[in-house]
Amino acid sequence: MNHSDALYKRIYQKLLTEIEEGMYKDGQRLPTEKELSQKYYVSRITAQKAMRALADEGKIVRVIGKGSYIAD
């Protein structure tokens, strides 16, 4: 596992925990990839990988040009 893989997994786990603890409500918009990259001091690609993993699991819905939202 390289450094960027570890970083994306850390962001993924942090967001997953926040989702499961109810920090975000169903349908609520999540921070953008740019906002996440600035918050966690990572590249936008790393933030994108974390968001893609959440989408692949059905935790969030990504809408091109609109953002990412908590799945209902």
Where are these regions (language model features)?
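Extreme N-terminal segment that seeds HTH/winged-HTH DNA-binding domains in transcriptional regulators
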Residues: 1-44, 52-61, 66
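Basic, amphipathic "hinge/linker" alpha-helix immediately C-terminal to the N-terminal HTH DNA-binding motif
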Residues: 66-72
